From Swiss-Prot:
The gene is NS1. InterPro entries: NS1, NS1A, NS1A_effect_dom-like_sf, uS15_NS1_RNA-bd_sf. The keyword RNA-binding applies. A motif (Nuclear localization signal) lies at residues 34-38. This is Non-structural protein 1. A motif (Nuclear export signal) lies at residues 137-146. GO terms for molecular function: protein serine/threonine kinase inhibitor activity; RNA binding. Residues 1-73 are annotated as: RNA-binding and homodimerization.
Amino acid sequence: MDSNTVSSFQVDCFLWHVRKRFADQELGDAPFLDRLRRDQKSLRGRGSTLGLDIETATRAGKQIVERILEEESDEALKMTIASVPASRYLTDMTLEEMSRDWFMLMPKQKVAGSLCIRMDQAIMDKNIILKANFSVIFDRLETLILLRAFTEEGAIVGEISPLPSLPGHTDEDVKNAIGVLIGGLEWNDNTVRVSETLQRFAWRSSNEDGRPPLPPNQKRKMARTIESEV
């Protein structure tokens, strides 16, 4: 096993522990708490994949961080912070919408790269909107936290979420996954639109009807993908 992989996991475990202590003092805002929960799932998945104990890794990560801080001067810290581009966290969904449990009458699941796509194939003839919480850097989608499909009545009928065991995805991965979800929902004569915020930062455009600019051949391909897996 690569030593950098192990040490990276150890540092991530310790930093999560620090953030958890911060949250326990009721100091974290909604985006902070949301990332904390999702990073916990990711660490559990990575720990299982690597065969490493999280508690032991946290202690080792603490030693690594302490060693770095002992060697770090205040001036070097200022320069590092100034050179790192800041990302923004954007929210279409409330914390309640993100954390709400939902159930599918006819469940369908597909894995696309490091993203998991889920939808209820029992939903028909509905108006559906896709909402997402994600981070943005350089005015482009950086990391998807969670995307969910809602009916006009507020019911959740679909979802795209990162796989905890496979961290890392691009904006193209997200757009492709959205295409799969749209294709599956439209196959049952649902009308799907994407939130203006998601259109703006994923496709850098905004259509009045809420339709992302998916090429016609891609939409046909997505519909066939869903159909073939039913």
